[in-house]
């Protein structure tokens, strides 16, 4: 049986009550040694892995439970083709005992599961397929199931809100398929009671943690990183009616590298971007092709291949229509052009060096079956006539019977004119004219114009004719001659159409029998299209080939550039990076605002990413070591639906890095801690960095850009070779601050916030007051409140008092200074002091 239903609940058996920790039971005495003096060790139960998977709209959600460590592992939503190659790699790597999924699945997933189910009776045995109702995988019910779970790693003292915040830092709730897979897995575990089959029913399946799962050959990058590095960026399309989603690719890395000529090339490039890899053989094979097309003597070949690739169309959709017998005339045209373009690609690649694997694959796998398909279509299909009649028609000399019927059909109008003249001779003299017409499916009819006296239905009756119907003031009849024509000629149009449809079906069978070749053509052609696009971008932007070295841990870049910023700026200052050893694993970068710190962080991340997808990079030289993940905390991706503050989102991003980063990970942090009190933010930043530094050689490669100069001044980080302090070089020219955008050793002396405020257009009095308060804080002096209006009134009162003094005539004998002071000066004192 291909699929099994989920078994019923296991009856509760004897066992400890829930809530009593295992440590509360007395430890059993060790067993006595046997006669041989050797103690028998308890055999460890074999680990079981139970996988839950969902596939929808080209994306895959995966979660599995490992009984060896009682941990649930999940993989964020990942794109996967209908062939489900990614799912197959997951199955090969984790080798699950069971695969849990929804009973309501797509056709591609159903075929894949059917194939898996057929392996259950083979050796080695395949996984058990378990189908659960689709309601168990609902998004909301799955989310509530996750949030309401009883987990031993969450303290009972946590409130419901704190629990939600904690779980949101571990589980990507924005990945809908992953959340649904996790919810379905929890439902399956509670039904099967994995590991607690013999315990009381109130004892739940132990879950000791949630961990992110990444295939060994892939590099882990979350959606926040894709967004802040501008690897992908969607924006509104100006002509919304032209595109289904209303979105187009904005200024992004994908946007500037996507020069693919066929749709499937664009899909493959996006797939490569979502799956950066560590397989050196695969990466070098991509770079070999790019390097070949960058040679000046191969430019013409690259342009010719690009032209051929523009004719490679959506073959799978055409094959699907053929299977459903819904083929259009345009499908035959598209398939014909695609196959002939594929033959052109094959002939071109056979003249290229066969030492490059892609050229060898195209030369060998684009077999003569393609020529057979193209020859069949070209010899059978009459494209000009098919477009005119909007249906499938065949060329002459394919079927003699069809040709004969078409000749008769062509000569039919003149023949019918002669028949109509004979019919008119036998009609009433009041009928001025008639015609014999042919209507498919009905046959030959005599058409007579309606006369004025023909009002009632009884007036339509004519002796010797059978009335059929009235249409557009013309009466249609069957006569003896039209009946004879039906017998002699038959329904020519329908017969021709039926015979041509039969030929089309036979041609479809010939094409479908070679569908695997066409699918392989699409795979290799799209791969060639992507590499030609990357080569074109590398040529135009001056990229160089990266080198991969498993010996170094990190990256080394000489004169690297930001691939997007250099296109927007008139001049761009390159900077180098060296984090390829055990020294300087944590780089603290200080400098004024707008000095280029954030651009440098993104530059390091983008160059590393480009190397991991097999692209040339914007640098003079780049050496990439072992990188397993890229984490970022650069920009807060806010959303009302998340229900989290900006600072909480920042903390979640840092928590992902702290919980998952290894010694092979790249972590980019920009201005962490600015979303809360400066003291608390500084303390959190220092605590995170000290946590990583305490790992020693296992510390990830961390780049931190910060304006917290106290981090250095207060020596909050331990001194040692793991920490390296860098700054963006600047120069003060009078009151102006000149940015050199050059990274150098050292620490910034000041933040120069007043200069940045002036650039932003703040009024000068505000900037002056800010500098005054800053100086008072540094010197430890009290800050007095100030009011510009009060100060202006004081000046006016002082001026008025001075004017009174100037008007005094000190030589006047009647002047009494005591009266002047008591009446004029002393009352004004409170207004001027």
Swiss-Prot record:
Keywords: ATP-binding, DNA damage, DNA repair, DNA-binding, Meiosis, Nucleotide-binding. PROSITE patterns: DNA_MISMATCH_REPAIR_2. One of its GO terms (biological process) is female gamete generation. SUPFAM superfamilies: DNA repair protein MutS, domain III, P-loop containing nucleoside triphosphate hydrolases. CDD domains: ABC_MSH5_euk. Residues 1-45 are annotated as: Disordered. GO terms for molecular function: ATP binding; ATP-dependent DNA damage sensor activity; mismatched DNA binding. SMART domains: MUTSac, MUTSd. ATP binds at residues 591-598. GO terms for cellular component: nucleoplasm; synaptonemal complex. Belongs to the DNA mismatch repair MutS family. Heterooligomer of MSH4 and MSH5. Interacts with HJURP. Interacts with REDIC1. Involved in DNA mismatch repair and meiotic recombination processes. Facilitates crossovers between homologs during meiosis. This is MutS protein homolog 5. It comes from Mus musculus.
């Amino acid at each position: 049986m291909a699929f099994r239903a989920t078994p019923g609940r296991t009856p509760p058996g004897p066992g400890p009550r829930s809530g009593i920790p295992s440590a509360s039971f007395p430890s059993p005495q060790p067993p006595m040694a046997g006669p041989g003096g050797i103690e028998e060790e308890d055999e460890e139960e074999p680990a079981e892995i139970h996988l839950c998977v969902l596939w929808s709209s080209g994306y895959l959600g995966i979660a599995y439970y490992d009984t060896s460590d009682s941990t649930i592992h999940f993989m964020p939503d990942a794109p996967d083709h209908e062939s489900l190659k990614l799912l197959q790699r997951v199955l090969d790597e984790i080798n699950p005992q069971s695969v849990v999924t929804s009973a309501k699945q797509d056709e591609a997933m159903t075929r894949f599961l059917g194939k898996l189910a057929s392996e259950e009776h083979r050796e080695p045995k395949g996984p058990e397929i378990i189908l659960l109702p689709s309601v168990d995988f609902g998004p909301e019910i799955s989310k509530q199931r996750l949030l309401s779970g009883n987990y031993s790693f969450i303290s009972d003292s946590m409130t419901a809100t704190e629990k939600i915040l904690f779980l949101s830092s571990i589980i990507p709730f924005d990945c809908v398929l992953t959340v649904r897979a996790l919810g379905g897995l929890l439902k399956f575990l509670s039904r099967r009671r994995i590991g607690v089959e013999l315990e009381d029913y109130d004892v739940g399946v132990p879950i000791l943690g949630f961990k992110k799962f990444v295939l060994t050959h892939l590099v882990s990058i979350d959606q926040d990183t894709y967004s802040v590095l501008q690897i992908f960026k969607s924006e509104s399309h100006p002509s919304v009616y032209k595109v289904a989603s209303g979105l187009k690719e904005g200024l992004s890395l994908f946007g500037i590298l996507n020069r693919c000529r066929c749709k499937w090339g664009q899909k493959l490039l996006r797939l490569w971007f979502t799956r950066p890899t560590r397989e050196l053989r695969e990466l070098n094979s991509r770079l070999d092709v790019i390097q070949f097309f960058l040679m000046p003597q191969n430019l013409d070949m690259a342009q010719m291949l690009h032209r051929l690739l523009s004719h490679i169309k959506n073959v799978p959709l055409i094959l699907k229509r053929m299977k459903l017998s819904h083929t259009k005339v345009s499908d035959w045209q598209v398939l014909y052009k695609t196959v002939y373009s594929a033959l052109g690609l094959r002939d071109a690649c056979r003249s290229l060096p066969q030492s490059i694997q892609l050229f060898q694959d195209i030369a060998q796998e684009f077999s003569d079956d393609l020529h057979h398909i193209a020859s069949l279509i070209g010899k059978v299909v009459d494209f000009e006539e098919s477009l005119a009649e909007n249906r499938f028609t065949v060329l002459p000399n394919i079927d003699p019977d069809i040709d004969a019927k078409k000749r008769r059909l062509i000569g039919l109008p003149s023949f019918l004119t002669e028949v109509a003249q004979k019919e008119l001779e036998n009609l009433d003299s009041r009928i001025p004219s008639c015609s014999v017409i042919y209507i498919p499916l009905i046959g030959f009819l005599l058409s007579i114009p309606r006369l004025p006296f023909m009002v009632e239905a009884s007036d339509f009756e004519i002796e010797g004719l059978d009335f059929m119907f009235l249409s557009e003031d013309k009466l249609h009849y069957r006569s003896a001659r039209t009946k004879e024509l039906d017998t002699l000629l038959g329904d020519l149009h329908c017969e021709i159409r039926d015979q041509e449809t039969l030929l089309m079906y036979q041609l479809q069978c010939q094409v479908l029998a070679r569908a695997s070749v066409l699918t392989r053509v699409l795979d290799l052609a799209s791969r060639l299209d992507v590499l030609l696009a990357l080569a074109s971008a590398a040529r135009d932007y001056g990229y160089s080939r990266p080198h991969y070295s498993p010996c170094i841990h990190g990256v080394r870049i000489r004169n690297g550039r930001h691939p997007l910023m250099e296109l927007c700026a008139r001049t761009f200052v390159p900077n180098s990076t060296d984090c390829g050893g055990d020294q300087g694993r944590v780089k603290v970068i200080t400098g004024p605002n707008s000095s280029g710190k954030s651009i440098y962080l993104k530059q390091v991340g983008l160059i590393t990413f480009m190397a991991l997808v097999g692209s040339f990079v914007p640098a003079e030289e780049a050496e990439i070591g072992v990188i397993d993940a890229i984490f970022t905390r650069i920009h807060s991706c806010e959303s009302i639906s998340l229900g989290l503050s900006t600072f909480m989102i920042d903390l979640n991003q840092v928590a992902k890095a702290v919980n998952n980063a290894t010694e092979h990970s790249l972590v980019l942090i920009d201005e962490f801690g600015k979303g809360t009190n400066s003291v608390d933010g500084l303390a959190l930043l220092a605590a995170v960095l000290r946590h990583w530094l305490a790992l020693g050689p296992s510390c990830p490669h961390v780049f931190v850009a910060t304006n917290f100069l106290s981090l250095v001044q207060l020596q909050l980080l331990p001194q040692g070779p793991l920490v390296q302090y860098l700054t963006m070089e600047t120069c003060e020219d009078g009151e102006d601050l000149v940015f050199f955008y050059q990274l150098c050793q050292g620490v910034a002396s000041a933040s120069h916030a007043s200069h940045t405020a002036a650039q932003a257009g703040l009024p000068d009095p505000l900037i002056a007051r800010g500098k005054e308060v800053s100086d008072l804080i540094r010197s430890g002096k009290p800050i007095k409140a100030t009011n510009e209006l009060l100060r202006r009134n004081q000046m006016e009162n002082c001026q008025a008092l001075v004017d009174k003094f100037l008007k005094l005539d000190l030589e006047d004998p009647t002047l009494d200074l005591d009266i002047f002071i008591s009446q004029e000066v002393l009352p004004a004192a409170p207004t001027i002091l």
